[in-house]
């Protein structure tokens, strides 16, 4: 996390160093009159200016893989790129600005505007391209921000024979393209949620000659307050599935949706309470392929005895990373996560149910102890971890006390000390280094 903040700050400083303030309008987008896009994209900018006929403000997508206001993509596979521009214009003084999508194509040696569509919107949330009807030509999916980020509308456009046709327009919170029913054709997976109304759902839509029709839908956890980007992957059984990390009032959960017997199902949710509790955990930890086996694992919390001495009776947890086959969560590995210092440690399976943890946030220490559940007492220390600032004099102090450096980054040094019992079990510095991971 610390590395991300530094990188982001450097990027912002670099942007301001490379460009003058006069290129920004009041809404921080680029006002082009005439266009100032340079290099290979300059002829496209000329075509946009000619088509627009006046001042316009380029609109950059706030999310997704495509972050440019002018996106080039070969949607029909003929080896020639098409360009898709997104901008706003005021039709006359005092009027609200309208948003445009402008398709610019190369005709012989020149670029020219082929088609435009106008919409009342404030910005672009994301852009995607996906062949939704199996004809070999990708549709253009545009998530429009209607009133800021509070309301979004997904528009699906087809561009064929020089014409841009809008196929659908509907509300969404998140969307992604995927082939969940394995029929060989991509569908649109749309999430809609309303924290205020507690009405959350997911639907799968198919593009036909008559437009976009709903194939399947199901309910999501009704108490969800925010939804992360859905991840298209597979169950451990190989069936296509969508993994959705969500924030609830009491933490985070993951819901996994897939098509079963011609229905979109969400087996991890309790249908009676309309809540998902099986994957409940602290916020900030999302599903991922934690062990690089090609299958997404879901983090599930497990209580662990705490040896922390504090006025607050803080509960401590280990994290079980579980694969899911559509019926059962199966633990693949267990880790002690230290989000404050930015690392996690994969625990030996031998320690399952036999350890306690000491958490000393002030001194950046985590220690694992052997624990007797019957007597509820801790025995000897197995492994101790400490995080020290890179140039801190305490680094040498800990080295003198028998600690060994595991790794370091641009900010901190991470050290460990292995107890006699752990050493007798075959745990050594190399073992610790192998199982110690910095969080991204």
Task: Place the predicted regions along the sequence by residue.
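A short, aromatic/hydrophobic, helix- or strand-capping loop or linear motif
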Residues: 362
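Generic N-terminal leader/processing signal
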Residues: 1-2, 104
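Beta-propeller-forming repeat regions
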Residues: 20-359, 368-370, 392-415, 431-440
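Short, exposed beta-strand-loop hairpins at the edges of beta-sheets
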Residues: 422-426
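A short acidic-to-branched-hydrophobic micro-motif
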Residues: 374-392
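Sec-dependent N-terminal signal peptides of Gram-positive bacterial secreted proteins and lipoproteins
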Residues: 2-26
């Amino acid at each position: 996390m610390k590395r991300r903040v530094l990188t982001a700050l450097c990027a912002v400083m670099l942007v301001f160093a490379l460009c003058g303030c006069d290129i920004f309008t009041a809404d921080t987008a680029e006002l082009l009159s005439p266009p100032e896009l340079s290099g290979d994209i300059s002829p496209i900018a000329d075509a946009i200016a000619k088509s627009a006929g006046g001042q316009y403000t380029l609109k950059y997508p706030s999310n997704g893989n495509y972050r440019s206001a002018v996106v080039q993509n070969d949607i029909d596979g003929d080896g020639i790129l098409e360009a898709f521009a997104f901008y706003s214009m005021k039709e006359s003084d005092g009027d609200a600005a309208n948003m445009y999508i402008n398709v610019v194509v190369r005709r012989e040696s020149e670029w020219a505007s082929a088609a435009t569509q106008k919409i009342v919107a404030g910005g672009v949330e994301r852009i995607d391209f996906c062949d939704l009807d199996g004809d070999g030509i990708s549709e253009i999916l545009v998530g429009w921000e209607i009133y800021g980020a509070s309301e979004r509308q997904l528009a699906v456009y087809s561009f064929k024979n020089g014409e841009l046709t809008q196929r659908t327009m509907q509300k969404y919170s998140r969307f992604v393209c995927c082939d969940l029913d394995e029929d060989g054709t991509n569908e649109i997976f749309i999430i809609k949620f309303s924290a205020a109304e507690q009405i959350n759902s997911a639907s799968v839509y198919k593009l036909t000659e008559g437009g976009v029709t709903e194939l399947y839908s199901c309910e999501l956890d009704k108490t969800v307050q925010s939804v992360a980007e859905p991840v298209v992957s597979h169950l451990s059984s190989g069936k296509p599935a969508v993994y959705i990390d969500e924030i609830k009032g009491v933490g985070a959960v993951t819901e996994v949706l897939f098509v079963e017997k011609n229905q979109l199902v969400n087996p991890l949710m309790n249908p009676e309470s309309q809540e998902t509790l099986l994957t409940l955990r602290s916020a900030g930890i999302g599903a991922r392929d934690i062990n690089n086996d090609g299958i997404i694992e879901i983090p599930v919390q497990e209580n662990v005895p705490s040896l922390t001495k504090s006025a607050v009776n803080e509960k401590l947890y280990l994290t079980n990373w579980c694969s899911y086959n559509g019926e059962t969560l199966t633990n693949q590995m267990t880790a002690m996560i230290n989000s404050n210092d930015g690392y996690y440690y994969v625990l030996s399976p031998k320690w399952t149910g036999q350890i306690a943890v000491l958490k000393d946030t002030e001194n950046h220490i985590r220690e694992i102890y052997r624990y007797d559940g019957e007597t509820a007492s801790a025995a000897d220390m197995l492994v101790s971890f400490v995080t020290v600032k890179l140039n801190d004099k305490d680094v040498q102090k800990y080295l003198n006390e028998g600690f060994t450096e595991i790794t370091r980054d641009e900010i901190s040094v991470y050290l460990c000390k292995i107890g006699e019992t752990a050493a007798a079990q075959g745990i050594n510095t190399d073992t610790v280094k192998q199982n110690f991971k910095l969080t991204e």
